[in-house]
């Protein structure tokens, strides 16, 4: 049960971060006075995940959650 709570908290935390990143991108685009195309949105999501290095982050999280370090 405790592991489930950790996982849910982690998912909530990562969701909050991704929402804040999207909001920052949207605010930056509103300053330009133009709307982003669908392709630009997809491209920004891909670059954000590459920059965040999610696979390494997931390995560290799993290591700490399951004490396999």
Curated annotation (Swiss-Prot):
Keywords annotated in UniProt: Amphibian defense peptide, Antibiotic, Antimicrobial, Cleavage on pair of basic residues, Cytolysis, Disulfide bond, Hemolysis, Secreted, Signal
Subcellular location: Secreted
Signal peptide start and end residues: 1-22
InterPro entries linked to this entry: Frog_antimicrobial_propeptide (IPR004275)
Coiled-coil zones: none
S-S pairs: 63-69
Tissue: Expressed by the skin glands.
Main location class: secreted
Function of the protein: Antimicrobial peptide. Has activity against Gram-positive and -negative bacteria, and fungi. Has little hemolytic activity on red blood cells.
Protein name from the UniProt record: Pleurain-A4
């Amino acid at each position: 049960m405790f592991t489930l709570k950790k996982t849910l908290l982690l998912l909530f935390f990562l969701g909050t971060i991704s929402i804040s990143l999207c909001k920052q991108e949207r605010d930056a685009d509103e300053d330009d006075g133009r709307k982003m195309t669908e392709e630009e949105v997809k491209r920004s999501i891909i670059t954000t995940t590459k920059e965040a290095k999610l696979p390494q982050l997931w390995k560290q999280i799993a290591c700490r959650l399951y004490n396999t370090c």
